[in-house]
UniProtKB/Swiss-Prot annotation:
InterPro entries xrefs: Calcineurin-like_PHP_lpxH, Metallo-depent_PP-like, MPP_YfcE, PdiEstase_YfcE_CS, Phosphodiesterase_MJ0936/Vps29
Cofactors named for this entry: Mn(2+)
Activity regulation description: Hydrolysis of bis-pNPP is significantly inhibited by sulfate and phosphate, which may mimic binding of a natural ligand.
Name of the molecule in the record: Phosphodiesterase YfcE
Function: Shows phosphodiesterase activity. Shows significant activity toward bis-p-nitrophenyl phosphate (bis-pNPP), an artificial substrate commonly used to detect phosphodiesterase activity. Also hydrolyzes, with lower efficiency, two other artificial phosphodiesterase substrates, thymidine 5'-monophosphate p-nitrophenyl ester (pNP-TMP) and p-nitrophenylphosphorylcholine (pNPPC). Shows phosphomonoesterase activity toward p-nitrophenyl phosphate (pNPP), with much lower catalytic efficiency.
One of the record's GO cellular component terms: cytosol
Underlying gene: yfcE
Organism whose genome encodes this protein: Escherichia coli (strain K12)
Phenotype for C74N: Increases specific activity with bis-pNPP and pNPP
Sorted UniProt keywords: Hydrolase, Manganese, Metal-binding
One example GO MF annotation: identical protein binding
Length: 184
């Protein structure tokens, strides 16, 4: 079974990036899935702790060969010039044995504007900075929250897919925030 780690809404935070890369190295995950808003903090957000987008790009480039990424609403062509993995696709798909993960940032496709999905597929998105791991109707919804600018009183968080279970995990203490089994 494929093991994936998900990080969203880094927004140029070097401490968050360092922690994500530390956990990725320890996790045994094959891929680090970045769900957009990689380098820029955006006009609606305050600067995250340790805002250093060029350093974040350098650190992420060290694992570029293990990154799958999608473009967020704060990502631009200029950001792509610093990164050694593609970030300009509005969505990607990861095919599992019996279902697919539809990866998107959440500003184009999301819970209120679903792409065409089949029963048991998983909508994986960021953008809201709010953790979600649940089944809604025939599909699963998964948002790992934000590693740098958490909202809704939640801690900074990331996601894991391991043994057909999607988990949102607190970045600081590894506690489980939300979890859903996706085996059809």
């Amino acid at each position: 079974m494929m093991k994936l780690m998900f990080a969203s809404d880094i927004h140029g935070s070097l401490p968050a990036t360092e922690r994500v890369l530390e956990l990725f190295a320890q996790s045994g995950a094959q891929w680090l899935v970045i769900l957009g808003d990689v380098l820029n903090h955006g006009p609606r957000n305050a600067l995250p702790e340790g805002y250093a987008p060029a350093k974040v790009a350098e650190r992420l480039n060290e694992v570029a060969h293990k990154v799958i990424a999608v473009r967020g609403n704060c990502d631009s062509e200029v950001d792509q010039m610093l990164l050694h993995f593609p970030i300009t696709a509005p969505w990607q798909q990861v095919l599992l044995e019996k279902q697919r993960l539809f990866l998107t940032h959440g500003h184009l496709f999301g819970p209120e504007n679903l792409p065409a999905l089949n029963q048991n597929d998983v909508l994986v998105y960021g953008h809201t900075h709010l953790p979600v791991a649940e089944q809604r109707g025939e599909i699963f919804h998964f948002n790992p929250g934000s590693v740098s600018i958490p909202k809704g009183g939640n801690p900074a968080s990331y996601g894991m897919l391991d043994n057909d279970v999607l988990s949102v995990i607190a970045l600081n203490d590894q506690s489980i925030i939300a979890q859903v089994a996706i085996n059809p």
